Amino acid sequence: MSEFQLVTRFEPAGDQPEAIRQLVEGIDAGLAHQTLLGVTGSGKTFSIANVISQVKRPTLVLAPNKTLAAQLYGEFKAFFPNNAVEYFVSYYDYYQPEAYVPSSDTFIEKDASINDHIEQMRLSATKALLERKDAIIVTTVSCIYGLGSPETYLRMVMHIDRGDKLDQRALLRRLADLQYTRNDMDFARATFRVRGDVIDIYPAESDLEAIRVELFDDEVESLSAFDPLTGEVIRKLPRFTFYPKSHYVTPRETLIEAMEGIKVELQERLEYLRTQNKLVEAQRLEQRTRFDLEMMLELGYCNGIENYSRYLSGRPSGAPPPTLFDYLPADALLVIDESHVSVPQVGAMYKGDRSRKETLVEYGFRLPSALDNRPMRFDEWEAISPQTIFVSATPGNYEAEHAGRVVEQVVRPTGLVDPQIEIRPALTQVDDLLSEIHKRTALEERVLVTTLTKRMSEDLTDYLSDHGVRVRYLHSDIDTVERVEIIRDLRLGTFDVLVGINLLREGLDMPEVSLVAILDADKEGFLRSDRSLIQTIGRAARNLNGRAILYADRITGSMERAIGETERRRDKQLAFNHEHGITPKGVFKDVADIMEGATVPGSRSKKRKGMAKAAEENARYENELRSPSEINKRIRQLEEKMYQLARDLEFEAAAQMRDEIGKLRERLLAV
């Protein structure tokens, strides 16, 4: 299937039809770069969905962080339910790269926790690009990091057709080559089980289906997809393609060839270190590298095999690493969301990675070829990028220099105008803010507050909380999943005010927010630049009563430019509304729609329903508790369960238990 089927009950309106027409025209004309300058709430994602639907090209959508990537994934999934919308972000829940600190002679081993579900989604994303023309991949800057080369990856693929002549032992050996493991007890992703002539295989990239291969003697009699949970056969298949468990899986002959190259480099490096009288470094390098070589010979891989990626992919020294961009077809389209943030990120990745690895090489922890296991440099990324659309309300300098065409989308179909901006003195900002919060919460509206420092955010949160405000604080120490949950809770009304520093800006879709308060707006710098101010003010642009208050004792150049641009957009929207007789309407979005896919994109709906049912039963049980002794008993039971869940690494369920215990303790105080 190469047709993109856009499913929506809306028609393009306002500036959207013209923006879509110009972008499609630019793509067809072969423009390398275009910019969609779209204000908050103007439906930029909807316009891009229409462009993708019309040009019918595989598309990579690059977001600046996982939170926005999750939001975009959910939106594109809703727009294209019949197409391959995939999610490709870093699969690390926790990542500590290996590093050496010479000043204290401290070596830090690589330590990482891989999210199994996101690993599955990454494999699913590359499979979609290799097999389908109707793929939309939502990604972050992790797409410029090294990945196994597509040529090597495709050589490992295994095709099975119904009617094929296939020896069972040969099939099991091929599965082992793909790094699948046999497990007849616990049937999980990238495993297989054997029962007589029936082999069940759980594909590495699949979340919901496993494949059953039934043999009759040495012939494939039947191929079918089945539900691994219930065993129910979903459909019969004429053919199926199995992909490796990892992007780094390598054919045996390539591995042997790579090992020879590694041995040659090792000898050269050892000679160099010894001539420099670096005997400790030489001994360390030889020991570590020979251990890796032995692991590769015996198992086909080793820990940190990505450090030998130059040899595994057969690329010369200094060549760019294979990345997700190498999996894109020639006619692909690149959409960079919030490009004023995303583009600088691409350039920043290489330098930080390089300095750490140079230290490892210098002190004998890695061969010099490890330097080629790196993210792409900015110039390499520019060279490999397909036709690009930059999407931003505040395009940066790079977009201005490279925009073949700038398409404005300033008018909102809903008629909503940009928030009114008010400047108030900074001297009384906290007390004034408190009175404004009370006005908004009385109307069941939400408030965002941005400060300059972490300390000020914490102090302000404590102050507001002491004055009876339901407030939370969003900061960089909170992980991606919890950040999404906090934003969701704000929208649901669990609390009314969210305080932050630099996290309440690009792309966050919160129609319930009617007031944005910017403290110390006159302190020039990155957090109070004109782009930052426009983005922050824009968080209130989806609400009919949207307003922004800038607390400042003087008007800076950045404030002047931000206010001027916001007023220009207001005037254009008001003129459009007057001309077409439009009465502004607020935006109403189901919370689940926006956050679909954010926590664990594509996770089983059955699991969600099961958790919801358990929560309902818990709530019913808690309501039946009356006396303090009953509540105390229940708390002890839940604590035991919570600790057991934590020991089993079921942290999400343990957190739910912790919340239940907190509620019960509050009830205990009230009894």
UniProtKB/Swiss-Prot annotation:
CDD domains in the record: DEXHc_UvrB, SF2_C_UvrB
Chain span(s) of sequence motif Beta-hairpin: 91-114
GO biological process, one term: SOS response
Record keywords: ATP-binding, Cytoplasm, DNA damage, DNA excision, DNA repair, Excision nuclease, Nucleotide-binding, SOS response
A Pfam family that the UniProt record links to this protein: ResIII
GO annotation, cellular component aspect: cytoplasm; excinuclease repair complex
Similarity annotation: Belongs to the UvrB family.
HAMAP family: UvrB (MF_00204)
Subunit structure: Forms a heterotetramer with UvrA during the search for lesions. Interacts with UvrC in an incision complex.
UniProt-recorded name of the protein: UvrABC system protein B
Gene giving rise to this polypeptide: uvrB
